[in-house]
UniProtKB/Swiss-Prot annotation:
Compartment(s) of residence: Cytoplasm, Nucleoid
Major localisation: cytoplasm
InterPro entries: YbaB-like_sf (IPR036894), YbaB/EbfC (IPR004401)
Lineage start: Bacteria, Pseudomonadati, Campylobacterota, Epsilonproteobacteria, Campylobacterales
NCBIfam families cross-referenced by the UniProt entry: DNA_YbaB_EbfC
GO molecular function: DNA binding
Function per UniProt: Binds to DNA and alters its conformation. May be involved in regulation of gene expression, nucleoid organization and DNA protection.
Record-linked Pfam families: YbaB_DNA_bd
Stated name of the protein: Nucleoid-associated protein WS1681
Length: 102
Protein backbone atom coordinates (compact mmCIF):
# COMPACT_ATOMS: atom_id res chain seq x y z
CA UNK A 1 0.00 0.00 0.00
CA UNK A 2 1.16 3.52 -0.73
CA UNK A 3 2.63 5.27 2.31
CA UNK A 4 2.22 9.08 2.04
CA UNK A 5 4.90 9.60 4.69
CA UNK A 6 7.48 8.24 2.23
CA UNK A 7 6.58 10.79 -0.44
CA UNK A 8 9.23 13.27 0.72
CA UNK A 9 11.91 10.57 0.55
CA UNK A 10 10.78 9.57 -2.94
CA UNK A 11 10.86 13.19 -4.13
CA UNK A 12 14.37 13.61 -2.75
CA UNK A 13 15.48 10.47 -4.62
CA UNK A 14 13.91 11.82 -7.79
CA UNK A 15 15.69 15.18 -7.40
CA UNK A 16 19.01 13.44 -6.78
CA UNK A 17 18.60 11.30 -9.89
CA UNK A 18 17.59 14.35 -11.96
CA UNK A 19 20.73 16.20 -10.81
CA UNK A 20 22.90 13.18 -11.62
CA UNK A 21 21.30 12.95 -15.08
CA UNK A 22 21.98 16.65 -15.73
CA UNK A 23 25.64 16.27 -14.74
CA UNK A 24 26.02 13.27 -17.07
CA UNK A 25 24.45 15.28 -19.88
CA UNK A 26 26.93 18.11 -19.45
CA UNK A 27 29.83 15.65 -19.62
CA UNK A 28 28.59 13.81 -22.72
CA UNK A 29 29.19 15.04 -26.25
CA UNK A 30 27.63 14.06 -29.55
CA UNK A 31 28.94 14.56 -33.07
CA UNK A 32 27.15 14.54 -36.42
CA UNK A 33 28.65 14.84 -39.88
CA UNK A 34 27.13 15.81 -43.20
CA UNK A 35 28.33 15.95 -46.76
CA UNK A 36 30.45 12.85 -46.31
CA UNK A 37 32.30 14.46 -43.43
CA UNK A 38 32.81 17.87 -45.02
CA UNK A 39 30.94 19.40 -42.07
CA UNK A 40 31.15 18.10 -38.51
CA UNK A 41 29.27 19.49 -35.51
CA UNK A 42 29.69 18.55 -31.83
CA UNK A 43 27.19 19.33 -29.09
CA UNK A 44 27.10 18.63 -25.37
CA UNK A 45 24.33 16.55 -23.89
CA UNK A 46 22.96 19.79 -22.49
CA UNK A 47 22.50 21.18 -26.01
CA UNK A 48 25.51 23.51 -26.05
CA UNK A 49 27.28 23.71 -29.41
CA UNK A 50 30.90 22.73 -28.76
CA UNK A 51 32.61 22.58 -32.14
CA UNK A 52 32.02 23.13 -35.84
CA UNK A 53 34.46 21.84 -38.43
CA UNK A 54 34.15 22.86 -42.08
CA UNK A 55 36.26 21.48 -44.91
CA UNK A 56 38.07 24.22 -46.82
CA UNK A 57 36.46 23.10 -50.09
CA UNK A 58 33.11 24.46 -48.86
CA UNK A 59 34.32 27.98 -48.14
CA UNK A 60 33.61 29.12 -51.70
CA UNK A 61 30.11 27.58 -51.84
CA UNK A 62 27.93 29.41 -49.32
CA UNK A 63 24.67 27.66 -50.25
CA UNK A 64 26.10 24.14 -49.90
CA UNK A 65 27.78 25.13 -46.64
CA UNK A 66 24.49 26.40 -45.22
CA UNK A 67 22.64 23.23 -46.21
CA UNK A 68 25.31 20.95 -44.74
CA UNK A 69 25.54 22.98 -41.52
CA UNK A 70 21.78 22.85 -41.02
CA UNK A 71 21.77 19.11 -41.65
CA UNK A 72 24.61 18.40 -39.22
CA UNK A 73 23.18 20.64 -36.50
CA UNK A 74 19.73 19.05 -36.81
CA UNK A 75 21.24 15.55 -36.68
CA UNK A 76 23.35 16.23 -33.60
CA UNK A 77 20.40 17.94 -31.89
CA UNK A 78 18.24 14.85 -32.52
CA UNK A 79 20.95 12.69 -30.92
CA UNK A 80 21.02 14.93 -27.85
CA UNK A 81 17.22 14.83 -27.53
CA UNK A 82 17.11 11.04 -27.94
CA UNK A 83 19.74 10.73 -25.23
CA UNK A 84 17.75 12.97 -22.88
CA UNK A 85 14.62 10.93 -23.50
CA UNK A 86 16.48 7.67 -22.90
CA UNK A 87 18.07 8.95 -19.69
CA UNK A 88 14.73 10.23 -18.42
CA UNK A 89 13.01 6.92 -19.09
CA UNK A 90 15.87 5.13 -17.37
CA UNK A 91 15.61 7.43 -14.38
CA UNK A 92 11.86 6.99 -14.10
CA UNK A 93 12.19 3.24 -14.52
CA UNK A 94 14.54 3.15 -11.56
CA UNK A 95 12.12 4.95 -9.28
CA UNK A 96 9.81 2.99 -7.02
CA UNK A 97 6.35 2.86 -8.55
CA UNK A 98 3.45 4.56 -6.85
CA UNK A 99 1.15 1.66 -5.94
CA UNK A 100 -2.09 3.62 -5.96
CA UNK A 101 -5.17 1.49 -5.55
CA UNK A 102 -3.28 -1.38 -3.94
Amino acid sequence: MFDPSKLSEMLTQFQDKAKEMEEKSHNTSFTAKSGGGLVSVSMSGAGELLDVSIDDSLLEDKESLQILLISAINDVYKSVEENKKSMTLGMLGGMAPFPFGS
